[in-house]
Swiss-Prot record:
This is Ketol-acid reductoisomerase (NADP(+)). Its EC number is 1.1.1.86. The gene is ilvC. Involved in the biosynthesis of branched-chain amino acids (BCAA). Catalyzes an alkyl-migration followed by a ketol-acid reduction of (S)-2-acetolactate (S2AL) to yield (R)-2,3-dihydroxy-isovalerate. In the isomerase reaction, S2AL is rearranged via a Mg-dependent methyl migration to produce 3-hydroxy-3-methyl-2-ketobutyrate (HMKB). In the reductase reaction, this 2-ketoacid undergoes a metal-dependent reduction by NADPH to yield (R)-2,3-dihydroxy-isovalerate. The lineage of its organism: Bacteria, Pseudomonadati, Pseudomonadota, Gammaproteobacteria, Aeromonadales. PROSITE patterns: KARI_C, KARI_N. Binds 2 magnesium ions per subunit. InterPro entries: 6-PGluconate_DH-like_C_sf, 6PGD_dom2, KARI, KARI_C, KARI_N, NAD(P)-bd_dom_sf. Belongs to the ketol-acid reductoisomerase family.
Length: 493
């Protein structure tokens, strides 16, 4: 199979990268009626599969799960989760021929085999759904001409999809129809109904394309969402311990610091996050972030270039063919890191202390969010998509670090995200260790006090204006208006 994006001409590539429209609430007035009375069969019962299915059933849809015969006979975890929640479970041969809509919610690595298996069993004119378009865009999966292909991609982990639905809300969502597979012109109606059934229409839905979703999703998760958190955690922990900080305190400051800092980011963007610092610390964080932006821009651009060209996907799929040898090796290295093995700190760290003692962490977040956003937009991705794939998702990923450090983050994210995370972090750590971490001063990280507390009013004014006038802050104000009811997600430190 050929990479679908690379088969398009430049005009088609730009058109699909730039497909982005914020849908009006009125467009979802019919809710999920289009799918009521239809049979929806979900392949896979992981975090997205289970939680989307629970929401869709609660919305009045007929939901069942299909699993491989071995998973059923051996009563594996996927079978256990589906049956424990009262869903009908059957083999591909039993359920796929009855389905009006088949949702492929398995891991990316399994998509090709799943589609090749279920496609011959699907009835004429049925629909196939994805929550991530890697199989279509990067693997170039060819799908039978009579099948409608749609995507609904919640911009949150599956657990949050469920929790927000239960409290009467939802999570921001992207939807798309594959232009090569909409034979009856019903793809948009199906995608809208699916998004509504999961609760996505209550928080805001972007009409996108498979291409835009995949390219922006890969970029966000590799850089700011996962790669920057991994690199920053390893570097900051090592720096603190090398300078005499109690390793247990250092571990807690980093583990819960990302979550606390990005909670402010979620509520009020980069501006609010920076406002949590004292004026001298804010100026220092701004200075450090500018230094990071200059140093790291080539790395961000390389990742975007490799994603656009398909080089990233080729490398990862080659590792699939080697039974994930690189992925498992990098995972093992992370598990042996000093940060991952730091003892728990019994004391309490006040919320403001995370900001006061984590000035460089604030700078890393600011620089990483802005760079990811700018790099995506420069590649033809619209600002709304770039916002969701950078700033919006960061607090959710930081929350996983707070639970069980980097191990939990890498377990929760997809195999695709984990592979890209390691690629980025493996380049970022030596770069920053050599050229950035030695430039830190007293007060940038940890409890040491900064020298001098004088503030230049004009410098502070310029820093505030530069932060607040960044394009991600402007689009963020609009999009956060649709999410103002989202609950705090912090697990606490």
């Amino acid at each position: 199979m050929a990479n679908y994006f690379n088969t398009l001409n430049l005009r088609q590539q730009l058109a699909q990268l730039g497909k982005c429209r914020f849908m009006q609430r009125a467009e979802f007035a019919d809710g999920c009626d289009v799918l009521k009375g239809k049979k929806v069969v979900i392949v896979g019962c992981g975090a997205q599969g289970l939680n989307q299915g629970l929401n869709m059933r609660d919305s009045g849809l007929d939901i069942s799960y299909t699993l491989r015969k071995a998973a059923i006979t051996e009563k594996r975890a996927s079978w256990q989760k589906a049956t424990d929640n009262g869903f009908a479970v059957g083999t591909y041969e039993e359920l796929i021929p009855t389905a009006d809509l088949v949702l492929n919610l398995t891991p990316d690595k399994q998509h090709s085999d799943v589609v090749k298996t279920v496609m011959p069993l699907m009835k004429q004119g049925a629909a196939l759904g994805y929550s991530h378009g890697f199989n279509v865009v990067e693997e170039g999966q060819q799908i039978r001409a009579d099948i409608t292909v749609v995507m609904v991609a919640p911009k949150c982990p599956g657990t949050e999809v469920r929790e927000e639905y239960k409290r009467g809300f939802g999570v921001p969502t992207l939807l798309a129809v594959h232009p090569e597979n909409d034979p009856k012109g019903v793809g948009m109606a199906i995608a809208k109904a699916w998004a509504s059934a999961t609760g996505g229409d209550r928080a805001g839905v972007l009409e996108s394309s498979f291409v835009a979703e995949v390219k922006s999703d890969l970029m966000g998760e590799q850089t700011i969402l996962c790669g920057m958190l991994q690199a920053g955690s390893l570097l900051c922990y090592d720096k603190l311990v090398a300078e005499g900080t109690d390793p247990a305190y250092a571990g807690k400051l980093i583990q819960f610091g990302w979550e606390t800092i990005t909670e402010a980011l979620k509520q009020g963007g980069i501006s609010l996050m920076m406002d949590r610092l004292s004026n001298p610390a804010k100026l220092r964080a701004f200075e450090l972030s500018e230094q990071l932006r200059t140093l790291m821009r080539p790395l961000f651009e390389k990742h975007m270039d490799d994603i656009i060209a398909g080089e990233f996907s080729r490398g990862m799929m080659a590792d699939w063919a080697e039974d994930d040898a690189k992925l498992f090796g990098w995972r093992e290295e992370t598990g042996k890191s000093a940060f991952e093995n730091a003892l728990a700190f019994a004391g309490k760290i006040a919320e403001q202390e995370y900001f006061d003692n984590g000035v460089v962490m604030v700078a890393m977040v600011k620089a990483g969010v802005e760079l990811a956003f700018e790099t995506m937009v420069a590649s033809g991705i619209y600002e709304e998509s770039a916002y969701y794939e950078s700033l919006h998702e960061l607090p959710l990923i930081a929350n996983t670090v707070a639970r069980k450090r980097l191990y939990e983050m890498n377990v929760v994210i997809s195999d695709t995200a984990e592979y890209g995370n390691y690629l980025f972090a493996n380049a970022a750590v030596p770069l920053l260790r050599e050229h950035f971490m030695p430039t830190l001063k007293a007060g940038d990280l940890g409890a040491s006090k900064a020298e001098g507390q004088n503030v230049d009013n004009l410098a502070l004014l310029a820093a505030n204006e530069a932060t607040r006038n960044h394009p991600i802050e402007k689009i963020g104000q609009v999009l956060r208006g649709y999410m103002k009811d989202m609950k705090r997600i912090a697990v606490g430190g």
